[in-house]
């Protein structure tokens, strides 16, 4: 011990010169000693825990016993390992996604920040524009706005009135697509001498025609038996409006085939002229510019006349098979037109089942006819003087007696129909000759470029001369036909 002290004293100057390095080495040695102690403590702790686990009671059911009992121990272990592997993979994927999202957030460049700022500006501008538009739609009414929209809504800046004006203006935006293109679908009616007493609106599809498709022939359209007679006969009593349930591009050609020279049908309307409401297209009779007291509609779809069901005569859709339902409708429609009816709606309402209207009308007519015959018989029996002279008229119009009024109306209607059809045939022939003569009277693009087009006055003179030639040719052919007969 003394020798060590002496050695330290003798070497003190040398150690003092290296004091800093010795101090550092001592600190490092101390830290290494502390770390080694910690490791020894943790190892001893784990060894103690392992001994405790070994001392725990083990299960009696070993793997050998379970295997002898028929239980597959290895499969259960494999499944457990597989599930553990899947959960570990899921955790790894979730951690990778979270880390990637964090990296994306950290990777925002100046361009991304600029885009985000512009997007915020856009949202602010859009919201402020919508708010300004909403306030503008709450303003007081202007003079040029629709009167129907102003109805029952006054000016003022109370919350209730502002909301009502906003709602009315907002709904008017959508009514542009729901309403017909014009407020009045038909022009004003002609003056009294040329005006028909009633307006009859009839549908085209499954009433006058029926279209069907098959693989062999494609689309085919059949015309209902009696359709030409139905239109021609009733055209002398009614202003007939053909209101198709299909779009114009599909139904216009069929409508033209039904009446090529527009002699029977006054106007054609299509699906574009319907009102779209509650998901269906409705044929609104109030848009026809006609008095609803004088309008009737015949249709096969209940939705078509749901706004005016009291003006409707419902019919079952025609399936393309031959029938006589069109002809059976004529007597009732003729009666309505010839009786100078003030309002058609109460008369239509008096029928219990409108779909069987022709049959019910025939029953009523038969009752009236029986009563009329009985009255005529009583009159003839009371006139004993004519009986003595042998001049008593025969009942029911045979031999010059009085006729039933509806029979007389029908006979007169048949005569007018024959005369009218004769005029139509002559007009068709005249139109055919006119088309043949006018087909060669055309002007080419060369005539337009060179200025060889006649003036409007010269064109009018040419048309008048051509019309005279057509009339003379038509009269000549007419005389030839009469001579051949």
Curated annotation (Swiss-Prot):
It is a single-pass membrane protein. Belongs to the TIM50 family. CDD domains: HAD_FCP1-like. It is found in: Mitochondrion inner membrane. One of its GO terms (biological process) is protein import into mitochondrial matrix. Keywords: Membrane, Mitochondrion, Mitochondrion inner membrane, Protein transport, Transit peptide, Translocation, Transmembrane, Transmembrane helix, Transport. The chain crosses the membrane at residues 121-137. Signal peptide: none annotated. GO terms for molecular function: identical protein binding; mitochondrion targeting sequence binding; protein transmembrane transporter activity. The keyword Transcription regulation does not apply. This is Mitochondrial import inner membrane translocase subunit TIM50. SMART domains: CPDc. Residues 138-485 are mitochondrial intermembrane. It comes from Candida glabrata (strain ATCC 2001 / BCRC 20586 / JCM 3761 / NBRC 0622 / NRRL Y-65 / CBS 138) (Yeast). SUPFAM superfamilies: HAD-like. InterPro entries: FCP1_dom, HAD-like_sf, HAD_sf, TIM50. One of its GO terms (cellular component) is TIM23 mitochondrial import inner membrane translocase complex. Residues 193-336 form the FCP1 homology domain. Residues 36-120 are mitochondrial matrix. Component of the TIM23 complex, at least composed of TIM23, TIM17, TIM50 and TIM21. Interacts with preproteins in transit. The keyword Membrane applies. Residues 1-35 form a transit peptide. Essential component of the TIM23 complex, a complex that mediates the translocation of transit peptide-containing proteins across the mitochondrial inner membrane. Required to direct preproteins in transit and direct them to the channel protein TIM23, and possibly facilitates transfer of the translocating proteins from the TOM complex to the TIM23 complex. Residues 76-111 are annotated as: Disordered. Residues 76-88 have a biased composition (Basic and acidic residues). Coiled coil: none annotated.
